Amino acid sequence: MPTMGNKNSMCGLKRFPNYKKSPIGSFAKNSSSHDGIKTIEAVNSCSFSRKADLCIRIITWNMNGNVSYEDLVELVGKERKFDLLVVGLQEAPKANVDQLLQTASSPTHELLGKAKLQSVQLYLFGPKNSHTLVKELKAERYSVGGCGGLIGRKKGAVAIRINYDDIKMVFISCHLSAHAKKVDQRNTELRHIANSLLPRDKRKRDLTVWLGDLNYRIQDVSNHPVRSLIQNHLQSVLVSKDQLLQEAERGEIFKGYSEGTLGFKPTYKYNVGSSDYDTSHKIRVPAWTDRILFKIQDTDNIQATLHSYDSIDQVYGSDHKPVKADLCLKWVNS
């Protein structure tokens, strides 16, 4: 089996030598199944060998057309125990975001590839000199139409397909149609994006990750009770009203995918520059619009552990909070 990871990866730490994990697909009391999505709790420990692991930090952020270097530094983080860094952006400004991201992620990581569809963007970073491990890299994009192109905030998706150290991965960053009533339209957009950007041959992808502003909202709950529950740290009550999970339960989207528990507060909509929810005349109902989902194609060959799934509340430059996931892969019997 191929050798993955680096000695500084989060799975190379020796603090948790006795931790044992179940392969994805056999999560016991820490998981709940839907027809479309398996919801799993993140674990804070890892027993993967430093010679047989690949750790990936995945970040999605709707930037609302704004950028500051300080926000990007906070986004990337100072602790770099991951191998690959995947950053998906929506409503990215016309400023040279890729250069700022490269500066923020140096000196530990370098840009391996990027994909852009105007304001929908995706960046993939690897450890310095890791480009030698890249056997294939392809960037693709798909537009779902609309007038977003006229105002520089396009809806659609971009993808990076990569073979990194013999692990074939597809990362898709997308921005779907807004507003609570457009559930069916979002479902249709997801199907069109999948048909366009995912390889037909499933053997060409060991790991598939969707990230982005998927724009699914809280269904049939008005603004005041939603905000009251969040204020009292009872946002978990709202999970059953999440449109994305509801559509997954109906079998409409993301069949066979996994997502971390929605333990963090809804990531939209905030007053820019603060952690206060929207007080404008629109007064949007808070929602988990920003999500990260993943799927292992063959769990007999590769196991996955989700180590974190959370929002990054210390970023204030947008009306969305970023979301990050730390995912580690392990070859079975390596």
UniProtKB/Swiss-Prot annotation:
Catalytic EC class: hydrolase
Summary of the knockout phenotype: Alterations in germination and in dark-growth seedlings. Elevated level of Ins(1,4,5)P3 and InsP2 levels.
SUPFAM superfamilies xrefs: DNase I-like
Assigned EC number: 3.1.3.36, 3.1.3.86
Gene Ontology BP terms: phosphatidylinositol dephosphorylation; response to abscisic acid; response to auxin; response to jasmonic acid; response to salt stress
SMART domains assigned: IPPc
Factors inducing expression: Induced by abscisic acid (ABA), jasmonic acid (JA) and auxin. Up-regulated in seedlings and down-regulated in mature plant by salt stress.
Main location, first listed in the record: membrane
Superkingdom of the organism of origin: Eukaryota
Tissue: Expressed ubiquitously.
Membrane-topology descriptor: Peripheral membrane protein
Gene Ontology cellular component list: plasma membrane
Function: Has phosphatase activity toward PtdIns(4,5)P2, and in vitro toward PtdIns(3,5)P2 and PtdIns(3,4,5)P3. Cannot dephosphorylate PtdIns(5)P, Ins(1,4,5)P3 and Ins(1,3,4,5)P4.
Family statement: Belongs to the inositol polyphosphate 5-phosphatase family.
Name of this protein: Type IV inositol polyphosphate 5-phosphatase 11
Organism annotation: Arabidopsis thaliana (Mouse-ear cress)
Name of the coding gene: IP5P11
